[in-house]
From Swiss-Prot:
Heme b b562 binds at H82, H183. A ubiquinone binds at H202. This is Cytochrome b. Component of the ubiquinol-cytochrome c reductase complex (complex III or cytochrome b-c1 complex) that is part of the mitochondrial respiratory chain. The b-c1 complex mediates electron transfer from ubiquinol to cytochrome c. Contributes to the generation of a proton gradient across the mitochondrial membrane that is then used for ATP synthesis. Its cofactor is heme b. Pfam families: Cytochrom_B_C, Cytochrome_B. One of its GO terms (biological process) is mitochondrial electron transport, ubiquinol to cytochrome c. It is a multi-pass membrane protein. PROSITE patterns: CYTB_CTER, CYTB_NTER. It comes from Debaryomyces hansenii (strain ATCC 36239 / CBS 767 / BCRC 21394 / JCM 1990 / NBRC 0083 / IGC 2968).
Length: 383
């Protein structure tokens, strides 16, 4: 017996990454999971080096970032890898979740895998938000002020919760130090959730584009899908390098290159692009509490999907009605992303409200209705 099978530690790696049987029909959409693992390792490694030179003091935070850019050997490279890596991380996250929505990877028996993935998504959003605040530029300060102020909408305890998070009466030095401590800690919790995600996936194995059992035709992970993953890894590194070396600030915000000034409000307070859809839902509600509830409910909708999808078939490969509603949902998501960066004025307010209504209608109405109609067509076709 080879050492990779006899060693108690290597045997775990072998069963998960080498001899793990995978459906032979898996296409390139299943490669995004390996890209997410690469992004996580890349973010943790670059973040560790940045933390060696970063100061979480409010007076020194912005200057310490500039010090990395100008005086630290390859500091600019680490900073741009970390900043653009966050954007590419969310690109891969949205692609991975879109694949799961289209191919029905959330359905039984993989409900736990999907639930763990949604929790990882929410934790990644929290980590990214706190990391964005640590630069302590103009947009970072006001983004931290606006988002933390949302908690004041909570009944009874909101007014006390916000000063507790701030560590004072406004975003100040204790806030920055708390955000830095949490931003350093949360990726390790995320890595633990990734392991749990792997464990849940290993029970029933990966799904496939056909939406049926792949037990009849499976191939080992190593030798087939490992080299297939390497193809997308090389493409990812090429695209990532183009941004890091040639256009490092395209995915950022120019206002964040100005030191934070609590006395001057930016013309518009806009988060990073990957948070814009949920920020658009927040802004589309005329009531503060309603906006906060809509933003958090939009995330919780993802957890309800295994219960609202009543289809007897997994995925949208052979379902035209569900395929059409999914493409409309995709267009609506990009519309929300665009609405989140525009000024709060007519007609963008109404467009954001319509897009928010469709987002919730997709999960609460379209998916159950379409799946029930397609079940009827399926049973009628079998008679």
């Amino acid at each position: 017996m080879t050492i990779r099978k006899s060693n108690p530690y290597l045997s775990l790696v072998n069963s998960y990454l080498m001899d793990s049987p995978q459906p032979s029909s898996m296409n390139y959409w299943w490669n995004v999971g390996s890209l997410l693992g690469l992004c996580l390792v890349m973010q943790m490694a670059s973040g560790m080096f940045l933390a060696m030179h970063y100061s979480s003091s409010m007076e020194l935070a912005f200057n310490s970032v500039e010090h990395m850019m100008r005086d630290v050997n390859a500091g600019w490279l680490m900073r741009y890898i970390h900043a653009n890596g966050a954007s590419f991380f969310f690109m891969c996250l949205y692609l991975h979740m879109g694949k799961a929505l289209y191919y029905g990877s959330y359905k039984s028996p993989r409900v736990l895998v999907w639930s763990m993935g949604v929790m990882m998504f929410m934790l990644t959003m929290a980590t990214a938000f706190m990391g964005y605040c640590l630069v302590y530029g103009q947009m970072s300060h006001w983004g931290a002020t606006v988002i933390t102020n949302l908690l004041s909408a909570m009944p009874f305890m909101g007014g006390d919760l916000v000063p507790f998070i701030w560590g004072g009466f406004s975003v100040s030095n204790p806030t920055m130090q708390r955000f830095f401590a949490l931003h350093y800690l949360l990726p390790f919790i995320l890595a633990a959730l990734v392991v749990m995600h792997f464990m849940a996936l290993h029970v029933h194995g990966s799904s496939n584009p056909m939406g049926m059992s792949g037990n009849m035709d499976r191939l080992p992970m190593h030798g087939y899908f490992v080299f297939k993953d390497l193809m997308t890894v090389f493409v990812f590194i090429l695209m990532f390098s183009l941004f890091v070396f040639y256009s490092p600030n395209t995915l950022g915000h120019s206002d964040n290159y100005m030191p934070a000034n609590p006395m001057v409000t930016p013309p518009s307070i806009v988060p990073e692009w990957y948070l814009l859809p949920f920020y658009a839902m927040l802004r589309s509600m005329p009531d503060k509490l309603g906006g906060v509830m809509a933003m958090f409910a939009a995330l919780l909708m993802l957890l309800m999907l295994p219960m609202t999808d009543r289809s007897v078939m997994r995925g949208n490969t052979f379902k035209m009605l569900s395929k059409l509603s999914f493409y409309l949902f995709l267009f609506n998501f990009f519309l929300l992303m665009n609405m989140g960066q525009l000024h709060v004025e007519v007609p963008f307010i109404e467009l954001g409200q319509f897009a928010t209504v469709y987002y919730f209608s997709y999960f609460l109405m379209l998916v159950p209705v379409m799946s029930s109609m397609e079940n009827m067509l399926f049973y009628m076709g079998n008679k």
